[in-house]
Amino acid sequence: MSAIVDIIGREVLDSRGNPTVECDVLLESGVMGRAAVPSGASTGSREAIELRDGDKSRYLGKGVLKAVEHINTEISEAIMGLDASEQAFLDRTLIDLDGTENKGRLGANAMLAVSMAVAKAAAEEAGLPLYRYFGGSGAMQLPVPMMNIVNGGAHANNSLDIQEFMIMPVSQTSFREALRCGAEIFHALKKILADKGMSTAVGDEGGFAPNFSSNEECLNTVVQAIEKAGYRAGEDVLLALDCAASEFYHEGEGVYQLEGEGLKLSSTQFADYLANLCDKFPIVSIEDGMAEGDWDGWKTLTEKLGTRVQLVGDDLFVTNTKILKEGIEKGIGNSILIKINQIGTLTETFAAIEMAKRAGYTAVISHRSGETEDSTIADIAVGTNAGQIKTGSLSRSDRMAKYNQLLRIEEDLGDIASYPGKGAFYNLR
């Protein structure tokens, strides 16, 4: 038995200089698991609650000492002596201890830090790499990366309404080559922007945040960068968008306001706007193409694009099986973004991935805009054979930590490692 003998929570800083929660779990054998949790910028209204102190005299009210205290007192008392290899039981213990629907009492940040640290300790105890501990002998597929190379919306101070413009290398036969492709395009784009006298400063997730006049101008420039790097857009590399449409949806009026382009569009018009972009550019994936509360708009978008474009629900589904189940039954979207801190435990995270796959939906494992050096999501992506990962651009070490971990995993897998390429979009025609 891998008995838990000590649990230590602490306040550390994330990639934006904001406090977050880190946890160490020590087992009887002497092995330790350590995990730090991420934090989002654009968040879904139904996400599990991230507990912040609200004390304006510390970190502008963003301290997490209450969450840390919960780890070091209540949570510690509840799981001390339990078997770390019983992940589902441990997570259920945390959920019952919290006792709320949204984890608002103990805080999803406290609960997730413990859940992840327990899994890491148990993997160490078992002598297994984390991805293998999660997925067993069947874990062998590396994910296609969604690389956010241009930031707009809530992730940047520019006139782009769409939050993320991403590239997805798909013609390569290994993750290593896909990563090289992405890096070369990133540097080609930097040169193009510099030559145009545009900003090459990077945003929260490592992408550039220049002041393009329209979404189309941005997409044209990304295609130019792909070609400048020696790749073919639509063949070697596909494009993906994260609209984060909830951020510019005006519920009272029922319109999507693209301020950068001076447009006010109904749900149907915005679906047409996105379809037009997909006709002009090799876009394979659109995340949060409608607002989280606009289910009629989501239905329209799914009927219009759902057979040829991956339509990913992030704010829509918030990694929650109850909401995902409703979406599946209503034919909303065809993919779910998986963010571990939206739901707050690993067991619930894996349940959402499993439900999506059973329904023929894809699952994209994702970082948050406020990240740490913790690379657990890389192991989750391989351990669940998810096929796709979204973990930022080709700069900032908080993003590189995940890519570098995937390189190590691919090396560890050796000849049995596979890279799905276009096969990651198994539900598109």
From Swiss-Prot:
Gene3D superfamilies attached to this UniProt entry: Enolase-like C-terminal domain, Enolase-like, N-terminal domain
EC number(s) per entry: 4.2.1.11
InterPro entries per the UniProt record, alphabetical: Enolase, Enolase-like_C_sf, Enolase-like_N, Enolase_C, Enolase_CS, Enolase_N
Free-text cofactor note: Binds a second Mg(2+) ion via substrate during catalysis.
Enzyme class (EC, first level): lyase
Top-rank taxon: Bacteria
GO molecular function: magnesium ion binding; phosphopyruvate hydratase activity
Main location: cytoplasm
Active site: E205, K339
Residues reported in the UniProt entry to bind (2R)-2-phosphoglycerate: Q163, K339, R368, S369, K390
SMART domains hit by this protein: Enolase_C (SM01192), Enolase_N (SM01193)
Keywords, comma-separated and alphabetical: Cytoplasm, Glycolysis, Lyase, Magnesium, Metal-binding, Secreted
Keyword Lyase: yes
Reaction(s) the record says it catalyses: (2R)-2-phosphoglycerate = phosphoenolpyruvate + H2O
A GO-annotated cellular component: phosphopyruvate hydratase complex
Localisation: Cytoplasm; Secreted; Cell surface
Record's function text: Catalyzes the reversible conversion of 2-phosphoglycerate (2-PG) into phosphoenolpyruvate (PEP). It is essential for the degradation of carbohydrates via glycolysis.
PANTHER family assigned to the protein according to its UniProt record, in alphabetical order: ENOLASE
NCBIfam families: eno
Protein name, as recorded: Enolase
Species, as recorded: Cupriavidus necator (strain ATCC 17699 / DSM 428 / KCTC 22496 / NCIMB 10442 / H16 / Stanier 337)
Gene: eno
